[in-house]
């Protein structure tokens, strides 16, 4: 019989032991190896005393997984899920169960990283390529990106693209039709102000009256009207304008494509293709342009290339456009986008196929026709005379209708519409969706007209079938869509399940092995944390629903904000930015507006260390700032003398510094407090990039250090999964003086001083639908668990660093020869001695069953390794064994035993086709060395499905659509 107390026994179900990889015995063994008595001793050795946080976090104690689920269930139950007819870019949809279970709830899909290592990412690359093909087919344009953050930010990117490529070089006006969604206009205005562009809003037909570089139109517009823009677009092209169209993805199944009308860019939200509304996100925006503008396209693009065997292989194409290479000259600061949601949308299209999508679109349209016929029969006046799914109604007693709608559990849209005489009239909007039924239409008649209307859906159906003019004949799509075999094969659940599984098997994710990407924090995304995001109480909430219906979300967002304020040491938090890059942008906007409020609009210079991530200069450029780069010293720290000199030199115009902490070199810089003081002395603000927050939580904080603003990557430090390239969340924390300058929103207001500020995202709380993950993470770990997680992250990194230092030089260390949560190993001496490159080692790790660490950042010719706290000593040792074995292989190249151009590193990764090839016998190493280099690999072999991919071939022969049908024959 046990002698332990009940309290001790109750602790056994706590989450901490599930989240942290090394158990107590493993931890002690690792501590002994690195030369520390305890986690506290190791923390003291690593974290500078001047920034050490000597208090507990105020986030409460940890709870069990069952308790956490019970708590969040109580919160979810406070949300009232009404039937939503609000529309405005967010609609009811049916998530096919085969996709929910096998993609959204599958760690093989949601724990993968952005496919920088394409040889072990062919599955999701194919799914993303399907998304691009879907986007191109529906829009009628040539080249699509893999996804953007949301429809409104896609609009801002379209404006930026138009400015880059328009031949109307002297023009500075971007025209926006006055019937676009208000949240889209909001984000455009925010971006335009930073770029110094003039936004003119007016009726669509007035666009020709301006000297402009670009214009934006909504198809269908916010009131539901469908317009043939062909003649208008022709006239605008004569003025050298670039034309962008915000389009509804479901309507494009039925309607003439914007590309065929002459649009240059088409974008929109793919949410209604099987992704829940989620109180605003996450959702994947599609973005498509003409081929002529390919070098200016924002976001990532998947292209077709070939591997060393000449076989078809997929990869990210034209990466030289992106922030991690082009920095402040990049097309966009977009990094993480919405790949998981793009994959869900693409699988939705694959599952339904063109005929299934047509049935869904025609059903939505038919029900809208029926609703319109019934209303007009009763004398109701419609604002629009054409429509796909949306009706705008005027002349009714809006309050009476709203009262009946509330009683019926229905949300309608209350809008305003400009009249020809300049006045404005209140209108009610109704947008139908895939989830709408004939019973719902009858209920809408009851709500809008009152009971006793006598309308019969079946009779109205017969009427509209015989005579419907809601879509003019010239606007009915005539061309075939989704003709590729992929969209016409997998319509049974069995076939769909197997297709998804076949793609999943090609990818390496956290459910197979550690992904030790430095600066990416690929930690556990626990199943219990993930569960609530699929609950309808969170998933089926419209972001613009009445606030009294979203009390559960209000509580969750409020508690999460309080916790993040405490963890960061700041005074206020904005949850609106829906990626880390957007967080940077929002934080810099707050700094910019703060200076302007003090009459210091001239302060526009941003100091950025040379070691910074590429998003930093890209975001600063986006905020209209000029970048001045500061040097780093030989130890990898910010060169204080250079910083002081440059801060003094630009003091009159200094806006801020962007600094990462711990540094991108993986150390706690001792001078961080002094850096903050120098910037403040010269009138600037300190932006502390939260990318490395996993080494701060519970030990120090940006606010305590002296920073003014930071973004937090919730998809790194706070357990939201990476999803193969998104979703992410990048909320920002600020000191009190910056709080009035946080992002506002034109649709949802909260009575705050920041309400009048521009938005950076389409939804007021960004991708609110995934915030329950972070809420659960903090709730389950509690104050002690969060701190201990950070400490174990330090332990794992230092254990790995010391083990690897016996075989590879470690580039940078901090006090007491320690690193923070990541370390950089220098491969340049090895390359010089043997000819083995960092690329060779990265690809060889695939043969050992590992994703490569971050390659050549922040220093070329290096690998940056971040194991996180979630990895056990067993997994760390397995990775270390692989790296040691690879070093031994490189030694055989160095000695001349293996040729530089014919060895297991140069030829990596190896596929089944390699070892089945009779010509393999001519290689100077065995098949076993190629694919089973250690005993551990035999126990858990991952097979890359393609050989090393030819990047140059892919960019020289750019092809970014599904491969031709002949490849399938």
Curated annotation (Swiss-Prot):
Subunit structure and binding partners: The glycine cleavage system is composed of four proteins: P, T, L and H.
Example GO molecular function: glycine dehydrogenase (decarboxylating) activity
Function: The glycine cleavage system catalyzes the degradation of glycine. The P protein binds the alpha-amino group of glycine through its pyridoxal phosphate cofactor; CO(2) is released and the remaining methylamine moiety is then transferred to the lipoamide cofactor of the H protein.
BP GO annotations: glycine decarboxylation via glycine cleavage system
Cofactor entry: pyridoxal 5'-phosphate
Name of the encoding gene: gcvP
Classification via InterPro entries: GcvP, GDC-P_C, GDC-P_N, GDC_P, PyrdxlP-dep_Trfase, PyrdxlP-dep_Trfase_major, PyrdxlP-dep_Trfase_small
Family: Belongs to the GcvP family.
GO CC term (a single one): cytosol
SUPFAM superfamilies reported in the protein's UniProt record: PLP-dependent transferases
Reaction catalysis annotation: N(6)-[(R)-lipoyl]-L-lysyl-[glycine-cleavage complex H protein] + glycine + H(+) = N(6)-[(R)-S(8)-aminomethyldihydrolipoyl]-L-lysyl-[glycine-cleavage complex H protein] + CO2
This protein's name: Glycine dehydrogenase (decarboxylating)
Keywords, sorted A to Z: Oxidoreductase, Pyridoxal phosphate
Modified residues (N6-(pyridoxal phosphate)lysine): 716
Statement: the UniProt record of this protein carries the keyword Oxidoreductase: yes
UniProt cross-references to CDD domains, sorted A to Z: GDC-P
EC number assigned by the record: 1.4.4.2
């Amino acid at each position: 019989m046990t002698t332990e107390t009940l309290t001790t026994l109750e602790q056994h179900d706590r989450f901490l032991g599930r989240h942290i990889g090394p158990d107590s015995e493993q931890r002690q063994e690792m501590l002994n190896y690195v030369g520390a008595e305890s986690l506290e001793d190791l923390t003291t050795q690593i974290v500078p005393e001047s920034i050490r946080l000597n208090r507990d976090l105020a986030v409460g104690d940890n709870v069990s997984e069952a308790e956490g689920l019970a708590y969040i269930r109580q919160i979810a139950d406070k949300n009232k899920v009404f039937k939503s007819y609000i529309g405005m870019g967010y609609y009811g949809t049916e998530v096919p169960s085969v996709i929910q279970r096998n993609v959204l709830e599958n760690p093989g899909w949601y724990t993968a990283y952005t496919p920088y290592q394409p040889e072990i990412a062919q599955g999701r690359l194919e799914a993303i390529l399907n998304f691009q093909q879907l986007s191109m087919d529906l829009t009628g344009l040539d080249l699509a990106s893999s996804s953007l953050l949301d429809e409104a930010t896609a609009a801002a990117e379209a404006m930026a693209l138009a400015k880059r490529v328009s031949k109307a070089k002297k023009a500075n006006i971007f025209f926006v039709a006055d019937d676009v969604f208000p949240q889209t206009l909001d984000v455009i205005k925010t971006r335009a102000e930073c770029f110094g562009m003039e936004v003119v809003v007016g009726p669509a037909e007035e666009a020709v009256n301006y000297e402009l570089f670009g214009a934006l139109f909504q198809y269908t517009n916010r009131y539901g009207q469908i317009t043939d823009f062909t003649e208008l677009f022709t006239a605008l092209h004569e003025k050298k304008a670039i034309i962008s169209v915000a389009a509804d993805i479901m309507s494009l199944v039925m309607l003439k494509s914007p590309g065929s009308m002459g649009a240059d860019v088409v974008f929109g939200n793919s949410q209604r293709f099987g992704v829940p509304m989620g109180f605003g996100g996450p959702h994947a925006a599609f973005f498509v342009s003409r081929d002529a503008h390919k070098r200016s396209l924002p976001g990532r693009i998947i292209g077709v290339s070939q591997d060393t065997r000449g076989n078809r292989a997929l990869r990210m194409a034209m990466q030289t456009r992106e922030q991690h290479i082009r920095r402040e000259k990049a097309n966009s600061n977009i990094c993480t986008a919405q790949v998981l949601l793009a994959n869900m949308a693409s699988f939705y299209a694959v599952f339904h196929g063109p005929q299934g999508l047509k049935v869904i679109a025609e059903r939505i349209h038919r029900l809208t026709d029926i609703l319109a016929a019934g209303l007009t029969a009763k004398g109701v006046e419609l604002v629009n005379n054409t429509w796909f799914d949306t009706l705008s109604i005027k002349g009714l007693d809006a309050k009476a209708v709203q009262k009946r709608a509330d009683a019926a559990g229905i949300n309608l849209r209350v809008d305003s519409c400009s009249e020809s005489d300049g006045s404005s009239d209140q209108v009610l909007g109704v947008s139908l969706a895939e989830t709408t039924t004939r019973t719902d239409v009858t209920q809408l008649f009851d709500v809008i007209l009152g009971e006793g209307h006598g309308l019969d859906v079946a009779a109205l159906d017969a009427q509209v079938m015989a005579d419907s003019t809601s879509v003019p004949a010239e606007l009915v799509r005539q061309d075939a869509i989704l003709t590729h075999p992929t969209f016409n094969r997998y319509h049974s659940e069995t076939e769909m399940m197997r297709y998804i599984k076949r793609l999943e098997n090609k990818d390496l994710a956290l459910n197979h092995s550690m992904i030790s990407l430095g600066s990416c924090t690929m930690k556990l995304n626990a199943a219990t944390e993930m569960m609530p995001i699929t609950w309808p109480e969170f998933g089926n909430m419209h972001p613009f629903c009445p606030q009294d219906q979203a009390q559960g979300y209000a509580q969750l967002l409020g508690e999460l904000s309080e916790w993040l304020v405490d963890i960061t040491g700041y005074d206020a938090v904005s949850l609106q930015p829906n990626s880390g890059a957007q967080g940077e942008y929002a934080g810099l906007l707050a700094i910019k507006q703060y200076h302007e409020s003090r009459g210091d609009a001239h302060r526009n210079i941003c100091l950025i260390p040379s070691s910074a991530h590429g998003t930093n200069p890209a975001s600063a450029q986006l905020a209209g700032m000029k970048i001045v780069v500061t040097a780093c010293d030989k130890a990898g720290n910010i060169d204080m003398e250079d910083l002081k000199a440059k801060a003094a030199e630009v003091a009159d115009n200094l806006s801020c510094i962007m600094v990462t902490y711990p540094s991108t070199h993986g150390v706690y810089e001792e001078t961080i407090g002094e850096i903050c003081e120098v910037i403040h002395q010269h009138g600037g603000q300190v932006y502390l990039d939260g990318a490395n927050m996993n080494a701060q939580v519970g030990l120090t904080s940006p606010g305590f250090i002296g920073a003014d603003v930071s973004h937090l990557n919730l998809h790194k430090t706070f357990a939201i999964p990476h999803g193969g390239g998104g979703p992410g969340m990048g909320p920002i924390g600020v000191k009190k003086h910056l709080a009035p300058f946080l992002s506002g929103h034109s649709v949802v207001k909260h009575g705050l001083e920041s309400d009048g500020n521009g938005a950076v995202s389409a939804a007021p709380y960004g991708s609110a639908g995934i915030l329950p993950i972070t809420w659960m993470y903090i709730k389950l770990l509690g104050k002690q668990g969060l701190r201990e997680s950070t400490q174990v992250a330090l332990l794992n990194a230092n254990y790995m660093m010391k083990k690897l230092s016996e075989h590879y030089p470690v580039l940078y260390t901090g006090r007491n020869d320690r690193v923070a949560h990541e370390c950089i190993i220098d491969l340049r001496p090895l390359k010089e001695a043997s000819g083995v490159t960092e690329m060779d080692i990265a690809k060889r790790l695939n043969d050992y069953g590992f994703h490569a660490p971050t390659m050549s950042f922040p220093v070329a010719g290096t690998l940056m390794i971040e194991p996180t706290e979630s990895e056990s000593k067993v997994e760390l040792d397995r990775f270390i064994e692989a790296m040691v074995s690879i070093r031994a292989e490189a030694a055989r190249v160095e000695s001349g035993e293996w040729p530089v151009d014919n060895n297991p590193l140069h030829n990596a990764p190896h596929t089944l086709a390699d070892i089945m090839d009779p010509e393999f016998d001519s290689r100077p190493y065995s098949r076993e060395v190629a694919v089973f280099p250690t005993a551990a690999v035999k126990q858990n072999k991952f097979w890359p499905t393609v050989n090393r991919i030819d990047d140059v071939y892919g960019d020289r022969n750019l092809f970014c659509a599904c491969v031709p049908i002949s490849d399938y024959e």
